C-alpha cells in the first residue's frame, strides 16, 4: 500500500499534498479554514448540480421552478437551503481565512496571496449571479442596481451595461447568461484552488510566529487531518442548525415576492457578505467615485504586501499592530451593519466615517505603526 501511495503518478500527488506534506508543528486552529473552504466549495458544487437539474433560467418560470424544487422535488427544500446558507458559511470562512492571512503575515507569500485575491473576486461574482437566479424582487433589483454601476465607466459605460444585460433592461437574456456563468464559475474557482495550493506547497505554510520552521516540520496526516476534522464537524453542525431551524435567517423576505420591474422594494440591499462593500459604495455621493471605492475595497488586498513595513512578519509580537487589526475588524462589522440600513442620518455619516477609516487604517495607520514598532525594538 505504501509503495502505491508513494510511487503511483496520481497517488503521489495526493500523498505530497495531503498525507506526507511537511507542515509547521505550531499552526493553530486559524489554519483550519483553508480545508473548510474546500469543504464549502464541494458542498456548493454538489447541491448546485442537483438544483440545476430542476431549475429553469426563464423569467416566466424561474421563480416557480424554485418553488417547485422546495415543494415537489424529494428533499429539494433541504438542498436549496443548504446551497443558500452554504454560501453564507463559505464567506464566513473566507473572511476569517483572509483575516488570518493579514494577522500572521501570510501575504508575504505573494503568488499564493494574489491567487487568493483572484479566488475572492471569482467567488463574489459567483455568489452575486447566484442571488439573481431565484428571480424574486431583491434578485431583480439587486441585479439592476449592481450591473448599472458599470454605466459609471466613462465613454463605454452605457454600451457595456446594455451588453451585459443583453438588452435595454435586466430581462430573460440577463437571467440566462447569469445562470450559465453561475454554473461554470465554481469549476473555475476549483481550478484556481488547485493553483493556490500548488503555490502554497512551493513555499510551505506560514505559522503563528512568522519565522521559518524548516527544522521542525511534522506530517500533515494524521496530525492536521484530524485537527481539520474537528473544524469540519463544527462547520457541518452550524450549517445543519441554520438550515433546519432558521433557513431564512440570512435571506431577505422581499425575495419571496416574484420579480416585478414596476415595483421598487423600499430598500435594495445585497446579501450580508457584500454589505461592507455596498456601504463603501453608498458613502460616496459621486457615482464613479463610489464604483472606484467599491473596487478598491477589495483590490486594496493586493497592496498589503507592498505596504508591509514591519521587520517581523507576524503580528503575534506586535501589540500596537494587533490593536489596529481589531479596529479594522470592528470597522468592517460597522460597515456591514450600515450597508443594511436605509440611506438617512445618522447612518450616512457613520458609513462615510467608517469608509474613510477603512482605507486610512490599511494605507496609512498600519504601515506607520509598523515603522514605530521597529523603532521601539531598535531595528
Curated annotation (Swiss-Prot):
Provide the primary localization. Answer: mitochondrion
Cofactor binding mode and count: Binds 2 heme b groups non-covalently.
GO biological process, alphabetically ordered = mitochondrial electron transport, ubiquinol to cytochrome c
Residues that, per the record, bind heme b b562: 83, 182
Where is heme b b566 bound in this sequence?
Answer: 97, 196
What the record says about family reads:
Belongs to the cytochrome b family.
Q: Needs which cofactor?
A: heme b
The gene name on file is: MT-CYB
Keywords, sorted A to Z: Electron transport, Heme, Iron, Membrane, Metal-binding, Mitochondrion, Mitochondrion inner membrane, Respiratory chain, Transmembrane, Transmembrane helix, Transport, Ubiquinone
Question: What the protein does?
Answer: Component of the ubiquinol-cytochrome c reductase complex (complex III or cytochrome b-c1 complex) that is part of the mitochondrial respiratory chain. The b-c1 complex mediates electron transfer from ubiquinol to cytochrome c. Contributes to the generation of a proton gradient across the mitochondrial membrane that is then used for ATP synthesis.
Which is a Pfam family this sequence falls into?
Cytochrom_B_C
User: TM segments?
Assistant: 33-53, 77-98, 113-133, 178-198, 226-246, 288-308, 320-340, 347-367
- What's the protein called, per UniProt? Cytochrome b
Residues the entry annotates as binding a ubiquinone: 201
User: Could you cite one Gene Ontology molecular function of this protein?
Assistant: ubiquinol-cytochrome-c reductase activity
Q: Name one GO cellular component term.
A: mitochondrial inner membrane
Spell out the note in the miscellaneous section: Heme 1 (or BL or b562) is low-potential and absorbs at about 562 nm, and heme 2 (or BH or b566) is high-potential and absorbs at about 566 nm.
**InterPro entries the UniProt entry points to:** Cyt_b/b6_C (IPR005798), Cyt_b/b6_C_sf (IPR036150), Cyt_b/b6_N (IPR005797), Cytb/b6-like_sf (IPR027387), Cytochrome_b (IPR030689), Cytochrome_b_C_euk/bac (IPR048260), Cytochrome_b_N_euk/bac (IPR048259), Di-haem_cyt_TM (IPR016174)
Protease keyword on record: no
Q: How does it sit in the membrane?
A: Multi-pass membrane protein
On subunit structure and binding partners, the annotation says: The cytochrome bc1 complex contains 11 subunits: 3 respiratory subunits (MT-CYB, CYC1 and UQCRFS1), 2 core proteins (UQCRC1 and UQCRC2) and 6 low-molecular weight proteins (UQCRH/QCR6, UQCRB/QCR7, UQCRQ/QCR8, UQCR10/QCR9, UQCR11/QCR10 and a cleavage product of UQCRFS1). This cytochrome bc1 complex then forms a dimer.
Cellular localization per UniProt: Mitochondrion inner membrane
Amino acid at each position: 500500500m505504501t509503495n502505491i501511495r508513494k510511487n503511483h503518478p496520481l497517488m503521489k500527488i495526493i500523498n505530497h499534498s495531503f498525507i506526507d506534506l511537511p507542515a509547521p508543528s505550531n499552526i493553530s486552529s486559524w489554519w483550519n479554514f483553508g480545508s473548510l473552504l474546500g469543504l464549502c466549495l464541494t458542498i456548493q458544487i454538489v447541491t448546485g448540480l442537483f438544483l440545476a437539474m430542476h431549475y429553469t433560467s426563464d423569467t416566466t418560470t424561474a421563480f416557480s421552478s424554485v418553488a417547485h424544487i422546495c415543494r415537489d422535488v424529494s428533499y429539494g427544500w433541504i438542498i436549496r437551503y443548504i446551497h443558500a446558507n452554504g454560501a453564507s458559511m463559505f464567506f464566513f470562512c473566507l473572511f476569517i481565512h483572509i483575516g488570518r492571512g493579514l494577522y500572521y503575515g501570510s501575504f508575504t507569500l505573494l503568488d499564493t496571496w494574489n491567487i487568493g485575491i483572484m479566488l475572492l473576486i471569482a467567488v463574489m461574482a459567483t455568489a452575486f449571479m447566484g442571488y439573481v437566479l431565484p428571480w424574486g424582487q431583491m434578485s431583480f433589483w439587486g441585479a439592476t442596481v449592481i450591473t448599472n454601476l458599470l454605466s459609471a465607466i466613462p465613454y463605454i459605460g452605457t454600451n457595456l451595461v446594455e451588453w451585459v444585460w443583453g438588452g435595454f433592461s435586466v430581462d430573460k437574456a440577463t437571467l440566462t447568461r447569469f445562470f450559465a456563468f453561475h454554473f461554470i464559475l465554481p469549476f473555475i474557482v476549483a481550478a484556481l484552488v488547485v493553483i493556490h495550493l500548488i503555490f502554497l506547497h512551493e513555499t510551505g505554510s506560514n505559522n503563528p510566529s512568522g519565522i521559518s520552521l524548516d527544522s521542525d516540520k511534522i506530517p500533515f496526516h494524521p496530525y492536521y487531518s484530524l485537527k481539520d476534522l474537528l473544524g469540519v464537524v463544527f462547520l457541518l453542525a452550524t450549517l445543519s442548525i441554520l438550515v433546519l431551524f432558521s433557513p431564512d435567517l440570512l435571506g431577505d423576505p422581499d425575495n419571496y415576492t416574484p420579480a416585478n420591474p414596476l415595483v421598487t422594494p423600499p430598500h435594495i440591499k445585497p446579501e450580508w457578505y457584500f454589505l461592507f462593500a455596498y456601504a463603501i459604495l453608498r458613502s460616496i455621493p459621486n457615482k464613479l467615485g463610489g464604483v472606484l471605492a467599491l473596487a478598491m475595497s477589495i483590490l486594496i488586498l493586493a497592496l498589503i504586501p507592498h505596504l508591509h513595513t514591519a521587520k517581523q512578519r507576524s503580528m503575534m509580537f506586535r501589540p500596537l499592530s494587533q490593536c489596529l487589526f481589531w479596529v479594522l475588524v470592528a470597522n468592517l462589522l460597522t460597515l456591514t451593519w450600515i450597508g443594511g440600513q436605509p440611506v438617512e442620518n445618522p447612518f450616512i455619516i457613520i458609513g462615510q466615517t467608517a469608509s474613510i477609516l477603512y482605507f486610512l487604517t490599511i494605507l496609512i495607520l498600519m504601515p506607520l505603526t509598523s515603522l514605530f514598532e521597529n523603532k521601539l525594538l531598535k531595528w
